[in-house]
């Protein structure tokens, strides 16, 4: 089963298959993910699914964005892969109740910068006198 997850500019693809319960991110075990808080965030779908997902191998390839965006995209892709592989609507509803972004992409992106200022909304001050 192949699923995707997106967050900001990061895109993650997860492949779920029967196995020993190993989760990899870009070929590395999830236990080696550099930031502990984000590692725990990535593992949330597996903790919620508990025994249902213990015999699934999930391989995630993630590109673009920063570490937080990649972690959120990976998390969504993993949750979708578990639901799609098990074909379990009850589990999907459980994910939605816990956190809607486990199943639905968080589509918020940074507003692009515009001319005449430092950011998307900020403008250079002008003097009237």
Curated annotation (Swiss-Prot):
NCBIfam families: PRK00474.1, uS9_arch. HAMAP family: Ribosomal_uS9_A. GO terms for biological process: maturation of SSU-rRNA from tricistronic rRNA transcript (SSU-rRNA, 5.8S rRNA, LSU-rRNA); translation. Keywords: Ribonucleoprotein, Ribosomal protein. GO terms for molecular function: RNA binding; structural constituent of ribosome. InterPro entries: Ribosomal_Su5_D2-typ_SF (IPR020568), Ribosomal_uS9 (IPR000754), Ribosomal_uS9_archaeal (IPR019958), Ribosomal_uS9_CS (IPR020574), Ribsml_uS5_D2-typ_fold_subgr (IPR014721). Belongs to the universal ribosomal protein uS9 family. One of its GO terms (cellular component) is cytosolic small ribosomal subunit. SUPFAM superfamilies: Ribosomal protein S5 domain 2-like (SSF54211). Signal peptide: none annotated. This is Small ribosomal subunit protein uS9.
